[in-house]
Curated annotation (Swiss-Prot):
Belongs to the DapB family. Catalyzes the conversion of 4-hydroxy-tetrahydrodipicolinate (HTPA) to tetrahydrodipicolinate. It comes from the Bacteria. Keywords: Amino-acid biosynthesis, Cytoplasm, Diaminopimelate biosynthesis, Lysine biosynthesis, NAD, NADP, Oxidoreductase. Pathway: Amino-acid biosynthesis; L-lysine biosynthesis via DAP pathway; (S)-tetrahydrodipicolinate from L-aspartate: step 4/4. The gene is dapB. This is 4-hydroxy-tetrahydrodipicolinate reductase. It is an enzyme of class 1 (oxidoreductase). GO terms for biological process: diaminopimelate biosynthetic process; lysine biosynthetic process via diaminopimelate. It comes from Synechococcus sp. (strain CC9605).
Length: 277
């Protein structure tokens, strides 16, 4: 019988981290071996008790590198490869990903905010270290289908705008998912939204951010939202709208577990769930 995949979760007490831990604990082929979180007063607490899952005998720690070092040594002795699932903050995600690779732990990064330059650097670093990893802007299979549909529709429409809507505690804008959708639409190499009038904004930024391709991206942040995205295409006499709504974070868990199971077979860092399905 194959040994379960050792999994460390960073951001363990956050909303996404908690969902990941529930999914990992419920998966027969995975084993929770680390829980990293810097919430004050939680150091040393049993993460299972904190999340209402019962005792899991995995203590919460704020020592990111210390945890990775210990797990790396443990799996090296056992011959299996560990995985880090990171849902933390854009300000630390680059350092977290690089540290995981350095310790030989496969990073599965759900935290958005990495720049193209940082992604390139991490991809090169992971390839040199022969440590597979994945940066996934959105773990929803439904969102991958929307992105593929948007890329196909972009062949036929010259006018398009993207709107992403998230809860008001999301730090980065636009979302990594929205940027990824735009990038897929731009692979055709065409320009969008040719100017037909001399526009003037009476309120700066009200028309959204515009990429070099001409695509416009809009961000909405409100309490009550989870994660939502709309791509609207326009042509004379018609509009075509694609929309995906995440109602509950449990929707991401099949994609998270899929990535955890596949990342150990990769030779370097990949970007996007579509690379794995």
């Amino acid at each position: 019988m194959t040994a379960p995949i050792p999994v460390v979760v960073a951001g363990a007490l956050g909303r996404m981290g908690a969902e990941v831990i529930k999914a990992v604990v419920g998966a027969e082929d995975c084993s929770l071996v680390g829980a990293i979180d810097n919430t004050p007063g939680k150091e040393g607490a049993d993460v299972g008790l904190e999340l209402g899952l019962g005792e899991l005998e995995v203590a919460v720690t704020a020592d990111f590198e210390g945890c990775l070092c210990a797990v790396s040594q443990s799996v090296r002795d056992s011959g299996s490869g560990a995985v880090l699932v990171d849902f933390t903050h854009p300000s630390v995600v680059y350092e977290h990903t690089r540290a995981a690779i350095a310790y030989g732990v496969h990073p599965v990064i759900g935290t958005t905010g990495l720049s193209p330059e940082q992604l390139n650097d991490l991809t090169e670093f992971s390839a040199k270290a022969s440590v597979g990893g994945a940066v996934i802007p959105n773990f929803s299979v439904g969102m991958v289908l929307l992105q593929q549909a948007a890329a196909a529709a972009a062949r036929f429409y010259d006018h398009a705008e993207l709107t992403e809507l998230h809860h008001n505690r999301k730090a980065d804008a636009p979302s990594g998912t929205c940027i990824k959708t735009a990038e897929l639409m731009e692979e055709l190499g065409k320009s969008f939204n040719p100017e037909e009038v001399d526009e003037h904004e009476s309120l700066a930024g009200c028309r959204g951010g515009q990429r070099d391709s001409g695509l416009r991206l809009h961000s909405v942040r409100l309490p009550g939202l989870v994660a939502h995205q709309e791509v609207m295409f326009g042509a004379p006499g018609e509009t075509y709208t694609l929309r995906h709504d995440t109602i509950d974070r449990s929707a991401y868990m099949p994609g998270v577990l899929l990535t955890v199971r596949k990342v150990g077979n990769l030779g370097s860092l990949v970007y996007g769930l579509e690379r794995l399905i």
